[in-house]
Amino acid sequence: MKFSQMPYQRPDLDAVLTGCKSLAARLAAAESEEELIHLYREENDFLAHYRTAQVLANIHYTLDTRDETWAAEQDWFDANGPAVANAETDIARAILSNPHAEALEKAFGSTVLPTLKNRVLSMDERVIDLQKEENALTSAYQRLYGGALVELDGKQLTIPQLTPYKQSLDPAMRRAAYEAEASYFDAHRAEFDDLYDRLVKNRTEQAHLLGYKDYSELSYVRMNRIGYGQKEVAAFRKEVEEQVVPLLRRMLDLRAKRTGIEHPMFWDSGVCFADGNPAPHGTYEELMAGARKMYHELSPVTGEFIDFMQDNEMFDVMSRPGKMTGGYEEIIPDYKAPFIFANWNGTSGDVDVLTHEAGHALEAYLAARTDIPQELQCPGMESAEIHSMSMEFLTAPWHHLFFGPDTDKYELYHAEDSFVFLPYGCMVDEFQHIVYQNPDLTPEQRNAEWLKLEQKYRPWNEFGDLPFYGRGAGWQRQLHIYECPFYYIDYCLATVIALQFFIAALHDHEDAWQRYLKLTRLAGTASYAELDRAAGMKVPFTPGSLTDLSREVETWIEQHQL
């Protein structure tokens, strides 16, 4: 069914809660392994109908945050979603109380019971009102950010539409683009500060009510991190600081020579080549045709997938006023249909959407066509991002369809950019640990902490007198910090595996692709480390785990300078 034809109906909250209560009682009383497994599947199917409505409402809302009809539906889910989450927690508690609970692990893999336990440990009716408020605050942030329009080059532009100007070969235009962005955040400084203040206090109160020392502890449970914790993530950040940051200093020196910019400032960071960054060649229709050709040639299953996506209107990728910034993929459960949302702006990032978000969508598409229960169809986000980030590299043999003579430039830019991202991702993560472990920090103190982390992870950045960024508030443009705290390190953990796929594909693309498919088809039935090992990849939590990888990527970058 085409997206435009998918009907939406607001769920009957009483019916959903009554159904959950009935299922919880039946699950607790199940008298055999077979009955418990059957009821677990029934519960997944029942809640999939609710999630379908929730996802449809959210997609329509983010497509135009100014639409009052869809804003009202989003508000309804913001207000009532926590009650449903609490009912799901009662279901998890009922399953875990059943003496046959271990049968689910035998049937569905190692993650099902830890996932249910984490749900019980991270939700309680005492925090329902706080979660309602949290949802309302994140939606307010989306409206504030998504509604941004700034003046530049005689035009009214959204924040995503500034990106090409940030990559302009004219240094004055680059600086002007950053200043235009900064002007919006500075004009709304009090609102951005207040929203984050209230979110930090809200989440901290939730953590305390649930018996946690601070929200960073609670977040690891809510993020369903299985098999590792804050200690391992801190060790990973240390590896990035020690192995990747020095490499990037050398790499950025090469980039400066390439661009001819003798003393790069922060607003020069988007320029990677003296004659301009690689940009996709072609119209929207031509890029979409290239995507169809690429995925048909990659494998039969990806050909089937891209036909489904394009034939059913499952892409909305053009930036426009009122549309939320950023990009995402969401599965619409009842239709087994992944939807891709993005904001194209004429840069290479447009092609990244056709690979990154399509990696997410392929996993969702495949999992929805198996007998894996719906709540196990997607793994933890550190694993889900492997699907997307690895796809960016595994589609390299077809990048010429989008970049033509600039393909070599794009390959170099993409490899460099993946490494540039790692320190930034670690910055975002460490910043959030600092904030939630010190929830009484003022806005000015939070900004000061961000600037300290700049020196630690990106010491090459010089802001001069650039507004907004110069005062340490640049983190406020990062959606995840407001909307889904502690998510961002997942991109880093996935990037390390994606870079291993990059190196593997250089040696044997077909073998790398088959290993990727093996990992992807496991969906959410295995943990991050189990998925990594299933694909023959190195888990990045031990000292020295990034040493060889960093060296191999650096060598490739040096050998492919243009």
Where are these regions (language model features)?
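Auxiliary, metal-adjacent structural segments of Zn-dependent hydrolase domains
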Residues: 275-334, 347-348
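Inter-helical turn/loop segments and adjacent helix faces that build the functional surface
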Residues: 230-231, 254, 258, 298-301, ...
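A well-structured
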Residues: 1-278, 290
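Long, well-ordered alpha-helical segments
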Residues: 196-207, 212-213, 251-255, 359-369, ...
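Active-site recognition of the HExxH zinc-binding catalytic motif
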Residues: 342-368, 388-389, 393, 431, ...
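C-terminal, non-catalytic "cap/extension" segments appended to globular domains
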Residues: 115-117, 227, 318, 354, ...
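Post-HExxH zinc-binding segment in Zn-dependent metallohydrolases
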Residues: 242-243, 367-368, 378-406, 414-415, ...
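Glycine- and acidic
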Residues: 122-123, 181-188, 228-234, 270-280, ...
